[in-house]
Amino acid sequence: MTSVAKVYYSQTTQTESRPLVAPGIRRRRVLTKDGRSNVRMEHIADKRFLYLKDLWTTFIDMQWRYKLLLFSATFAGTWFLFGVVWYLVAVAHGDLLELGPPANHTPCVVQVHTLTGAFLFSLESQTTIGYGFRYISEECPLAIVLLIAQLVLTTILEIFITGTFLAKIARPKKRAETIRFSQHAVVAYHNGKLCLMIRVANMRKSLLIGCQVTGKLLQTHQTKEGENIRLNQVNVTFQVDTASDSPFLILPLTFYHVVDETSPLKDLPLRSGEGDFELVLILSGTVESTSATCQVRTSYLPEEILWGYEFTPAISLSASGKYVADFSLFDQVVKVASPGGLRDSTVRYGDPEKLKLEESLREQAEKEGSALSVRISNV
């Protein structure tokens, strides 16, 4: 009796098992190259209610154009709302001119005879302009209570809105944009070991404290019971030459993962650029100037992992004795020894996509026994 294969998702079990990459469909990634989630949430019960329960996070995550629109609408709305209340107070007290108040009548709010005047008084009170033309008299205690309530409520509202603005500006997200990952990962020998390498650089002079780079291998995994786990996550460890847990990220650094018998990458088709997996890289650290925790993310698909290449050296020494990091060389790679074969003595620089295409053409020509001359540019 054969067991029925099941597919497990985040919170949902379905009866159909589909690969991450279907034939003829462009390979999709869970995480974009700039670290944003590429997952769409659907069929969430009471989604709006859940967002309203956590207003602070909702407002901070809100895009700037909506935040500015909400900011303006909130202030204008409170001015108008309390203006209507002030107008109703004037109507109830008989302060309007069309009601024919007696000559010795003392209004609740002096010079408030129309809805426009009530709106202007509400605006002047809330913004503490205080022109002096419209003011509260001692005749109406209700007006005094209303003024206190308006100032207290609107002050709380201003504190909340201002706090969300400051929190959004101070988020370490913008600091994360000055941390750069290489566009491609490369596989070559390093210190006699086959390694998968990525390059990371800090483009600011201020440092990140306690940097750590971790990796997650995402792929479909089938258990012994026949269950297909969509996007199974496996840890992939990275280190620098010093094997330190906290590298000194003052210059562009290359992080290594040794592809040995214990590596989760050992059975993957890294050389062919094919396969159904995604390698997610996460760099975490503390911003030196603000002590806020910063996280930078990127991901690599199989075609973004280059076999038999190393990164071009991007650090040099100037005539004045200063180290220079040339970011025009940051993503460039050089053809080196093909892992498992002899070292190629010809050094080639250029665009990784072009190099990868030319290398595949060269290998195809060698298999057919024909001589093929491929010109590689230094662009």
Swiss-Prot record:
Extracellular topology ranges: 89-114, 132-140
Positions bound to 1,2-dioctanoyl-sn-glycero-3-phospho-(1D-myo-inositol-4,5-bisphosphate): R36, K168, R171, K173
SUPFAM superfamilies from the UniProt entry: E set domains, Voltage-gated potassium channels
Intramembrane segments: 115-131
Tissue expression profile of the protein: Predominantly expressed in the brain, including in glial cells of the cerebellum and forebrain. Expressed at lower levels in the kidney, and other peripheral tissues.
Consequence when changing R65P: Decreased potassium ion transport. Results in a shift to a more alkaline pH for channel activation
Key word Disulfide bond present: yes
MF GO annotations: ATP binding; identical protein binding; inward rectifier potassium channel activity; potassium channel activity; signaling receptor binding
Its biological purpose: May be responsible for potassium buffering action of glial cells in the brain. Inward rectifier potassium channels are characterized by a greater tendency to allow potassium to flow into the cell rather than out of it. Their voltage dependence is regulated by the concentration of extracellular potassium; as external potassium is raised, the voltage range of the channel opening shifts to more positive voltages. The inward rectification is mainly due to the blockage of outward current by internal magnesium. Can be blocked by extracellular barium and cesium.
The name this protein goes by in its record: ATP-sensitive inward rectifier potassium channel 10
Native source organism of the sequence: Rattus norvegicus
Gene of this entry: Kcnj10
